[in-house]
């Protein structure tokens, strides 16, 4: 039992910012990789948005372009920890659209992404971030 308590104590001393950095990198990588795939396979992307995804309201080419642009830009903000809380919001929206209209059976994966984003929205990016440096420099909160 003593070993378990020692392990727990060691883990409790690890900075939460390490986990926050890993969360930003992991969820950002999922979206960035999807954006790169859309960019490098643009004709296939358009075909998927037209024939398979069928996102309502938006024309397929506009929806594809918007998805690609968000998937390539918002993860960079997450990687840098810049505007992190704001960057999570459009990603939540993308997850909601994907879950509702595109891949409703992939709810476990979407819930995992959403949980990570929710943590970042609630707790911020941590000390290993530009948000933290800016807050320190200009006297804002962490």
Where are these regions (language model features)?
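Short Gly/aromatic-enriched secondary-structure transition segments
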Residues: 44-52
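Extended, low-polarity transmembrane helix blocks
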Residues: 1-43, 57-69, 73, 79-142
